[in-house]
Amino acid sequence: MSGLNHNRRTILIGIGNDGRSDDALGWLFADRFAESSDLEVIYRYQLQVEDAELISAYDCVIFVDASVQEMETGFCFQECRPAASVHFSTHKIDPATILWLTKEIYQASVQGYIFAIQGYEWELKQQLSEKAAQHFQQALLYFEQDILPAIAAGVEQIMTPSERI
């Protein structure tokens, strides 16, 4: 989709691993918009501290990742707010921590969202499970019909499904 509001820059970060079945959901989602839209798109195996600097140049970031959590619709789009968290591993940094680092280090307030898509299989395989593929298609439709138009309109805060009720 073209015609996005270039005054409000948005980056989509696809998180996952395309060699581990449903863990590829984030990357496959990013693939869909890498060439066909004005969204900036990047891929990550996992989030890194350096991503705080990257997203500081944007107004909005959408983190897309597979999830083991069961969801009624097979996907969930929700706001992500900056929050400091402490982990005893450098291999686990969540989106809220990245947003917090962006605000603390770069004094940048970036609107953040998490788009989680339910997955079921995580073994070494380059194919989505049948259920995850269905959720993926539903998530794409939702994103194209509800999220992209809001971004294109320059909406400063995208309403999540729970906020519409």
Task: Indicate where each model-derived feature is located.
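N-terminal catalytic or cofactor-binding beta/alpha core of small enzyme domains
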Residues: 1-119, 126-138, 142-165
